[in-house]
Curated annotation (Swiss-Prot):
Alphabetic keyword roster: Actin-binding, Cell projection, Lysosome, Membrane
Disulfide pairings: none
Gene that encodes it: KPTN
Name listed for the protein in its UniProt record: KICSTOR complex protein kaptin
Region called Disordered, residue ranges: 256-277
GO biological process assignments: actin filament organization; cellular response to amino acid starvation; cellular response to glucose starvation; negative regulation of TORC1 signaling; protein localization to lysosome
Quaternary structure, from the entry: May be part of the KICSTOR complex.
Protein's organism: Gallus gallus
Its biological purpose: As part of the KICSTOR complex may function in the amino acid-sensing branch of the TORC1 signaling pathway.
Lineage top rank: taxon: Eukaryota
Subcellular location: Lysosome membrane; Cell projection, Lamellipodium; Cell projection, Stereocilium
């Protein structure tokens, strides 16, 4: 039996028109969120100190070269990889040109010193690219080129294919570059990619790439970033369109319910145990529009052979979005699913024998289209931004349970260190 949601709604901002599953993007740091609507409007949502209080503020940004009759499809943003500086925003839209709609990708980036992170300045510095396909998801990924890192846009389309856009430093603009040179694992997809997820394996020069397609095809690849060699690749075929895929570390819980192996969630509180960070065991969440959502455990060791179901995930119409959170503040990761049936579902991993269990649900006034985690208030804990059909809801941790959890972890840490000192004092000298 699912319990109540431990998060409280801190704010709700109405959108000027409806959004979609690709319409929410987190700005780096505490910069807030960008929410795009179908009728060509982009809102900047953030928390601001007003009259000695922290208040949510939403204002429209005036991005240039977006026609009044344009329909925004997707939005994405990233901060340039060091040593380069600056914020990059990408917006795809379709312009109604009468007989035939015209798709475009606008990339915004200001090269004027002192304006690289000013959103209003960035919104006026546009590169307009006409597309030969209908755009879908716009995301970004970091690539290693020699001894340098660079961040690129990846745009899926209905051609079907995935297109790569990288900055040409000499020309001070972005341009499309061949996909196979940097992402050979994303070639020759059988249908349009609805969702793509790329993550770098910590303390390595390798990455994992997952893609889910409209035909139900799912592919996961393990790639050497230096040589671009595909070290391992797995694929499966499901019955319906894949709405989202998500790669994430999944560790075995210990007897206290906390995560073993030293891996800490983004919202974990309290000190961590000393020692090197272990390499996480990556698992893959696959959400389908007509089937139950599943997690393939430890893909690097087991491929796509060990499947764990998320019970009840198919009871609320299609699953549209997913993200990781740490609502229990136990160092583990919960999986959040947003559904067209207006429910937000939270699942926790209870070990190999019990698998995933439904922790809590929360209902919203409309379909849950997009989820995004970000520290919007600057308190060190990540809020959960929930994008619904015509509104943006922000959920945050309750203060009292969070403070209590912090005290518990501090007590355990003090006891652990006292036990270590006692053991050292009674050791036998050599």
């Amino acid at each position: 039996m699912a319990g109540p949601c431990p998060l409280v709604e801190d704010s709700c901002s109405r959108l000027p028109s409806q959004s979609n599953v690709y319409g929410l993007a987190a700005l780096p740091g505490a910069g807030g969120l960008l929410a795009a609507t179908l009728k060509g409007k982009v809102l900047h949502f953030r928390y601001q100190h007003l009259r000695h209080k922290l208040r949510p503020v939403a204002r429209e940004l005036q991005f240039t070269y977006i026609p009044v009759d344009a329909e925004i499809v997707s939005i994405g943003c990233f901060q340039k990889s060091a040593p380069k500086r600056g914020l990059v925003v990408g917006i795809t839209f379709i312009k109604d040109s009468g007989d035939k709609p015209s798709p475009f990708l606008n990339i915004y980036c200001d090269y004027e010193p002192g304006c690289e992170f000013d959103l209003d300045s960035v919104a006026q510095s546009c590169l307009n690219l006409e597309l030969r396909f209908t755009p879908l998801q716009l995301c970004h990924a970091e690539v290693h080129i020699g001894d340098r890192c660079d961040t690129v846009f990846l745009l899926s389309g209905t051609d079907p294919g995935i297109h790569l856009y990288r900055e040409n430093e000499g020309l001070h603009q972005f341009e499309e570059q061949p996909l196979h040179e940097l992402f050979p694992e994303l070639q020759e997809l059988p249908s349009s990619a609805l969702w793509l997820d790329v993550c770098t394996v910590p303390s390595s020069r390798r990455r994992l790439t997952a893609v889910g397609c409209q035909s139900g095809y799912v592919r996961v690849a393990h790639v050497d970033q230096d040589t671009r060699a595909v070290l391992q690749s797995w694929s499966i075929q499901q019955d319906g369109p894949i709405s989202t895929v998500l790669l994430f570390p999944l560790e075995e819980p210990d007897d206290d319910g906390d995560v073993a192996g030293g891996h800490r969630g983004a919202d974990d509180v309290g000190p961590s145990a000393p020692g090197p960070e272990p390499t996480p065991h990556y698992s893959l969440l696959v959400a389908s529009t007509i089937e139950m959502s599943v997690v393939y455990r430890d893909v690097l060791s087991r491929g796509l052979t060990e499947q764990l179901s998320l019970p009840g995930s198919d009871h609320h119409d299609a699953v549209l979005c997913a993200m990781l959170a740490c609502t229990a503040l136990d160092g583990g990761r919960e999986v959040l699913l947003g559904t067209y049936g207006q429910e937000l579902l939270c699942y926790a991993y209870r070990g190999r024998r019990c698998g995933f269990q439904l922790l809590w649900t929360r209902r919203f006034p409309g379909p849950v289209l997009a989820l995004c985690g970000a520290d919007l208030t600057g308190d060190g804990l990540r809020e959960v931004a929930v994008g619904c059909l015509q509104g943006l809801h922000v959920l945050q941790h309750s203060l009292e349970p969070t403070a209590q959890r912090l005290k518990e972890r501090l007590r355990r840490e003090v006891a652990r260190r006292a036990q270590q000192r006692g053991g050292e004092g009674t050791g036998t000298p050599k």
